[in-house]
């Protein structure tokens, strides 16, 4: 009888734990403690590898072939501002889901993106609500 009661208690504990986990995954970023604000940013959509490794990189020049190859290889996509800040796209749901599809049509282009920005220890991310190409800023393709 004790084994039966113990078994039932374990099953209830597992059900309660799995239900709590499912609820936690469905929550949005409300209540997040990260520094966040509504912003509009402008910058170049590209991979993150080169701007992190090369401090001379700018938001108005790049090698489109290099950027495309890095993204195809799995490098994260980001928006590089003229100030040198990199904003990674994130979703507004938990668990997070891939945001590459939102930025891929803009690779190599200068954009204006509006959304909720999060900052934590120097890392920046943005939940993009609107994005459009900025046509009056020319991006120079420096080749390979």
What are these regions (language model features)?
Residues 1-7:
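Positively charged n-region of N-terminal signal peptides that target proteins for export
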Residues 7-18:
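Bacterial N-terminal signal peptides
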Residues 20-144:
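OB-fold and OB-like single-stranded nucleic-acid-recognition modules
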